Amino acid sequence: MKLQCCFTIRCCIVLLGLGAGSASRSLVAAEPAAPGAIRVAIYADAGASKKGSPRVQQCLPAEQGFQIAKITAEEIRAGKLRDFDVLIHPGGSGSKQAHTLGLEGRKHVRQFVRNGGGFIGICAGAYLGSASYEWSLNLLDARVVDSEHWARGKGEVQLRLPPAGRTALGIDQDFVAIHYEQGPLLAPGENRDIADYELLAAFETEIAENGAPAGVMKGTAAIARGAFGKGRVVCFSPHPEKTSACESFLRDAVRWAAPAKPD
């Protein structure tokens, strides 16, 4: 199944001589991270939206302690994740990202998180991080509800935040509006080998287009986080980077997922 969840990414580091069609070339930054900076790799290969988006970069500015670089599936298979603290898988197609990584690449991502790295999945990346498909990474103990109607539409939805979500996301209100683009509707996966996730936000309103049944989306998990081995995982079904009032959610998620820096 091809799961589309479009949003685009752009890296703050541009490498000379990199052509639009050279996704297999090295994209990893050669410069060392600033002291204390969280080193963030953004997946930039087949399955990620082609246009690229400044929004993820804008949410993670250097002056707030983030260092961003793109990474390809080939580099992941070559072990380049060792140079990073957190991996972000963005929107696009979760299944295509998985198949581009291949079995070996998916093993590297799982090992990276198991050993203490952080994983952030946004929309398609949340499909990838779930435990719902044969190609899923099985990092978050979550299954996708009503996957048949994944193309249920796009638009603004309301999220309901429980106390844990308000604390984790640094917001003092029960409800927040956020942009949604056909992300997964998540529910507990009941996988005994993966820790139960913590609900940070649930869908309070829904979009039910293109034949999707009404009454399914409300109450399912929109933002969830959990542990995998020594690492941490956060999955966003909607798009905090496309919602000005929610951009801080992504920063907080990356900080939480990143391994602690030594003193």
Predicted regions: what is each one?
Residues M1-C6:
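N-terminal secretory signal peptides that target proteins for export/translocation
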Residues R10-S22:
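Bacterial N-terminal signal peptides
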Residues A33-I38, R110, S136-N138, R143-D146, ...:
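Extracellular ligand-binding/catalytic regions of CAZymes and related secreted enzymes
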Residues R39-A41, D45, S49-E134:
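Helical hinge/lid and interdomain linker segments adjacent to catalytic or ligand-binding clefts
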Residues A48-G52, K96-Q97, S147, A208-E209, ...:
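Short, solvent-exposed loop/turn elements at domain surfaces
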Residues V157-R232, S237-S244:
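Catalytic beta-strand/loop cores that center a nucleophilic Ser/Cys/Thr
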